[in-house]
Design a protein with these regions (language model features):
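Short alpha-helical elements
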Residues: 1-206
Length: 206
């Protein structure tokens, strides 16, 4: 089995790319054509998020790991990922496919050991969220729990697992205190304007 087949198992389909491409931020001005396509780099980001591995382990078929990480980091800082999600929500709402029976839950992600004190000679991700101390600001979404450094994602999703809102907290944060905040973060703009929809028909939680 080739590495291409393994890497491409869950890449974007042509139909998904056709839906996604018009929503992406505009690229740089005309110049030397990029070595890797946006589709390659985005598939690389998606692969890395699914696999949960260091950026350096992203398969070469997606481009250099530095290019994959650079796109992720640039769009994260610019708020582009959140804007893309909102645009997809708008299209889904206009098509009437959002199921407003909403489920609220959370999942914990273990952080890499370098997350709270990365070395500065990595050639790429050299800027840690904080110093090597035990303290992490609340807005970094990183804290110590029984499993070590972890982050917790609190989500509200519809029946088809379509994300409607997400909050990131430190891993030791409880679910109940975030319940209202997760629901209050639901806001799906309407395609033709008007007030965004924020109220589910029903909420499921445990």
């Amino acid at each position: 089995m080739t590495s291409v087949a393994v890497a491409g198992r869950a890449d974007l389909t042509d139909a998904q790319w056709a839906r996604l491409e018009p929503l992406l931020p505009c690229g740089k001005k005309a110049g030397r054509p990029p070595k890797w396509t946006k589709r390659q780099l985005i598939d690389g980001i998606r692969w890395r998020c699914r696999a949960g591995v260091p950026w350096r382990d992203v398969p070469a078929e997606y481009g250099s790991w530095q290019a994959v990480y650079a796109l992720f980091r640039r769009w994260q800082r610019a708020g582009s990922w959140a804007a893309i999600v909102t645009s997809l929500q708008v299209l889904a709402d206009a098509a009437g496919v959002i199921d407003w029976q909403v489920s609220v839950d959370s999942t914990t992600a273990r952080a890499h050991p370098h997350a709270a004190g990365a070395r500065h000679d990595s050639g790429g991700q050299g800027e840690p969220p904080a110093g090597p101390s035990e303290y992490e600001p609340a807005d970094h979404g990183l804290g110590r729990s029984r499993g070590g450094w972890t982050s917790k994602l609190h989500l509200a999703c519809d029946r088809d697992c379509r994300v409607l809102s997400v909050l990131v907290t430190a891993g030791q944060a409880g679910d109940s205190p975030q319940f209202t905040a997760v629901l209050d973060s639901i806001s799906v703009p309407r395609l033709g304007g008007g007030r965004a929809r924020a109220r589910p028909d029903r909420v499921l939680a445990d």
